[in-house]
Structure formats: structure tokens, C-alpha cells
């Protein structure tokens, strides 16, 4: 995957460029991302997490091969070149099997890596930082690195077997807290120290040497660290460059390495740009994209209520609420407080747990019903101005068709545009 290696090379040469990673499996989010990358003639990095997609199907019901097929089919339908598409696997390791003994969890992790690599994923994030059932808490750097090296060996062997060459690119390390947004209310966040980052790198270098993997070190392109960015349900901790200065300077001593920043969702455009300048040059974004999708759908549902008799409405918001109450497993342990606080969180939280519910057949039917209702006749411009004001400006200037799908996709692309600008470089 020359795109990533070339991006890192240019960044290390002073271009202050980067790349964003779209971490979503929602078809409309992916369509928005593919169309945006196509219009801007940039490569597109799409990542699946070990929770979403695994050899058993993950919570999306897709294996890595299924996910690749799904994304490639969508890209083909939109005439996006396959060679500009990069697929990544995020937090690959024993994450899904922490309740099992380490030996069993790591055997599953071996198979997880095989399934991702065999399916053609080229950017592999090795994350063995989580303790399994019979492990100490927390794990030492050495144990984490030994397990990552074991998975790297599996990945290399699988890649050679299936593709005749080893061209994988690796990301190592992890951020704190866990992926997908913090569970608790945040006020400040500890930035990874340079010493901790160096210790992670050295432990991995030593473990890779022991596995005979010295040659792949230049293909370890990024280290995941915590630059001090995070979000909870209603708050965002903004990037403060001064707190990350020492960390940022530390990576300048490694000629083929940059940082990868997770949970960059909801950062300001200025913060996103500064992160890239400060060598956090791979920006992960996921919940902010499905949050934008949800915003657009709620806006269209409000427009529908103004235009369509109640008995003919899709009732999307009520259907969504009913399904979330019937199946609370994706939000119950995340949203706290009284009934009203939990209701607001279900609809509006930055952590966007609602994203797990869009594939539900009842909700999908209501979405299709909403789109049908609003596609029958033109949406009055004053209602677009009221509920989707940013899109209204583009509709009036003639650059955007005011159909439900185009309004949704463009609203998502407003977020992608911030990431594109941050990553463009000088």
C-alpha cells in the first residue's frame, strides 16, 4: 500500500500532511466518504474495528472478507478506483475475548489477523494491551509487545501465502481510554509521556527481533498515543498543543514513524490541523460521521412532520426510541442519570450509541419510509433553511440537489471536509 508509506515519507520530509481514517460500516457514511475522496482525487482509508468485523461476524454480522466485498462493491458502483482504496483493521488482538484465558483469546486473535490479512486489509493495528481472564492488570509493556509480535508474524505469513509478497503496514500501541469515546464524564486527559511512547516502541522492537521480524520495522508506520483529545456524552476535550510538545518532538527522532490519534471526533478544524502539524498525522474519525448522519435524519424527520399527515409519517424517531428501549444492550451501560437524561443521551450523545441500531430492520424500514415521503415532491426551501441551514446555502447556489439522500450525504461530507483540510499539508 504505497499511499500510506508515501504519506509518511512526505510528512517526515516536512510537508505537514496526513490522512484521515473513516471508521464506520454505515452505507451512507461510506458513500459520502467515497464520493468526497473521488471529488478531491485523494486516496481513502476505511477501517473496521475488531468489534465490528471479525472471523465470526462481529456486531455488523460481517467477516473481513464480507466487509471488503461490501466496501469494494460500493466503490465500484461509484467508479472509485480500487487502487485508491486502503482498508485497515483497528484494535486487532484479543479485544473481543478478554473474558477468556489468554491462550484461548490469543488463538482467536491469530485467526482474526489471518482473516483480515487474507481478505486484503493492508493497514493492521496490532493491539494486545487488554488483559484477558487469567492476566495481571495492567499488562506489562513486554507482554503486550510479545503478543503483538506473535500476531505480526501470523500477518506476514498470511500475506505471503495469499499475495506472494509482504506489503502490510502496521500500527502499534493503544490510547487510553477504550475505543469509541469515554464512558464517564471527562474534564482533563493525561497526554502520553515521551518515556511511555519510547518504552512501547523499544518493547515492540525487541519483541519483533525475537520473532525474526527485524525487516518489517520500517513498515511500522505509526504509534497510537493519547495527544489529549477525547469526548464523552456532552463534552469535548480539545487538543492543547502545549501539553503535547514533548511527545510531538520525540517522534521526530524516528525516520519512518508518525503518530496515530484516535477519538479525534468533534475536535475543531483548527485543532485537527494542529494535530497533523504536530505529527499526529493519522486521524481516526467514526462517531462524528454517524452523529452527522443522525443529525440529518432527525432534521428530515422534523421536515416530514411539517409536510406529511401524522398517520402517513415514518415515525422514524419514535421507532428508533422504541427499538433502543427494547434492546438496550448497546447503550445501557454507557448512559446514566434519570429517565430524561438517558432519553436525551439516546438521541443526542456525542458517543452516538444510536449508530449500533441503524441496521435494525424496523429502523431501516422507517428510514426508507421517510426518504419515500420526502422524495415524492420537492422539499420547500424555507424548511431546508430551517432544519439544514448549511445545506440550504449549497442548494440555493445550485451545487446541491435538495433530495433526502443528497442532503444527508452532504451533511456528512461537511465533517469529512474538515478532516480533508486538516490533512492536506503544505
Curated annotation (Swiss-Prot):
Pathway recorded for this protein: Carbohydrate metabolism; D-tagatose 6-phosphate degradation; D-glyceraldehyde 3-phosphate and glycerone phosphate from D-tagatose 6-phosphate: step 2/2
Pfam families, A to Z: GatZ_KbaZ-like (PF08013)
One GO term of the biological process aspect: phosphoenolpyruvate-dependent sugar phosphotransferase system
TM regions (residue ranges): none
GO CC terms: plasma membrane
Classification via Gene3D superfamilies: Aldolase class I, putative tagatose 6-phosphate kinase domain like
InterPro entries: Aldolase_TIM (IPR013785), GatZ/KbaZ-like (IPR012062), GatZ_KbaZ_carbometab (IPR050303), TagBP_ald_KbaZ (IPR023435)
HAMAP family registered for this protein in UniProt: Tagatose_aldol_KbaZ
Family from the record: Belongs to the GatZ/KbaZ family. KbaZ subfamily.
Described function: Component of the tagatose-1,6-bisphosphate aldolase KbaYZ that is required for full activity and stability of the Y subunit. Could have a chaperone-like function for the proper and stable folding of KbaY. When expressed alone, KbaZ does not show any aldolase activity.
Subunit structure of this chain's protein: Forms a complex with KbaY.
PANTHER family for this protein: D-TAGATOSE-1,6-BISPHOSPHATE ALDOLASE SUBUNIT KBAZ, N-ACETYLGALACTOSAMINE PERMEASE II COMPONENT-RELATED
Name this polypeptide is given: D-tagatose-1,6-bisphosphate aldolase subunit KbaZ
Amino acid at each position: 500500500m504505497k499511499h500510506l508509506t508515501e504519506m509518511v515519507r512526505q510528512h517526515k520530509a516536512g510537508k505537514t500532511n496526513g490522512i484521515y481514517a473513516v471508521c464506520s460500516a454505515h452505507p451512507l457514511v461510506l458513500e459520502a466518504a467515497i464520493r468526497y475522496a473521488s471529488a478531491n482525487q485523494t486516496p481513502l482509508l476505511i477501517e473496521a474495528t475488531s468489534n465490528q468485523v471479525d472471523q465470526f461476524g462481529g456486531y455488523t454480522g460481517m467477516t473481513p472478507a464480507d466487509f471488503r466485498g461490501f466496501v469494494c462493491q460500493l466503490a465500484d458502483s461509484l467508479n472509485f478506483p480500487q487502487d485508491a482504496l486502503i482498508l485497515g483493521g483497528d484494535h486487532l488482538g484479543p479485544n473481543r475475548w478478554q473474558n477468556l484465558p489468554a491462550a484461548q483469546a490469543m488463538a482467536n486473535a491469530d485467526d482474526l489477523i489471518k482473516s483480515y490479512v487474507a481478505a486484503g486489509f493492508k493497514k493492521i493495528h496490532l493491539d494486545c494491551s487488554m488483559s484477558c481472564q487469567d492476566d495481571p492488570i495492567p499488562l506489562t509493556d513486554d507482554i503486550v509487545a510479545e503478543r503483538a509480535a506473535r500476531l505480526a508474524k501470523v500477518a506476514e505469513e498470511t500475506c505471503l501465502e495469499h499475495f506472494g509478497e509482504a506489503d502490510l503496514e502496521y500500527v502499534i500501541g493503544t490510547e487510553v481510554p477504550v475505543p469509541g469515546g469515554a464512558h464517564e464524564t471527562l474534564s482533563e486527559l493525561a497526554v502520553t509521556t515521551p518515556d511511555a511512547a519510547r518504552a512501547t516502541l523499544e518493547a515492540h522492537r525487541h519483541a519483533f527481533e525475537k520473532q525474526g521480524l527485524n525487516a518489517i520495522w520500517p513498515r511500522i508506520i505509526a504509534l497510537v498515543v493519547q495527544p489529549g483529545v477525547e469526548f464523552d456524552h456532552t463534552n469535548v476535550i480539545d487538543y492543547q498543543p502545549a501539553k503535547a510538545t514533548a511527545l510531538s518532538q520525540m517522534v521526530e527522532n524516528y525516520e519512518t514513524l508518525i503518530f496515530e490519534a484516535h477519538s479525534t471526533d468533534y475536535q475543531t478544524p483548527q485543532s485537527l490541523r494542529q494535530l497533523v502539524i504536530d505529527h499526529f498525522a493519522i486521524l481516526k474519525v467514526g462517531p462524528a460521521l454517524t452523529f452527522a448522519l443522525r443529525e440529518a435524519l432527525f432534521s428530515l424527520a422534523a421536515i416530514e412532520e411539517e409536510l406529511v399527515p401524522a398517520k402517513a409519517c415514518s415515525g422514524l424517531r419514535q421507532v428508533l426510541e422504541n427499538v433502543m428501549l427494547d434492546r438496550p444492550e448497546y447503550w445501557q451501560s454507557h448512559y446514566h442519570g434519570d429517565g430524561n437524561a438517558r432519553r436525551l443521551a439516546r438521541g443526542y450523545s456525542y458517543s452516538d450509541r444510536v449508530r449500533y441500531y441503524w441496521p435494525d430492520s424496523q429502523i431501516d424500514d422507517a428510514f426508507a419510509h421517510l426518504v419515500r415521503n420526502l422524495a415524492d415532491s420537492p422539499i420547500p426551501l424555507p424548511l431546508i433553511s430551517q432544519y439544514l441551514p448549511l445545506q440550504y446555502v449549497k442548494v440555493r447556489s445550485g451545487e446541491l440537489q435538495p433530495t433526502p439522500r443528497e442532503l444527508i450525504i452532504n451533511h456528512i461530507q461537511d465533517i469529512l471536509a474538515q478532516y480533508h483540510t486538516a490533512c492536506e499539508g503544505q
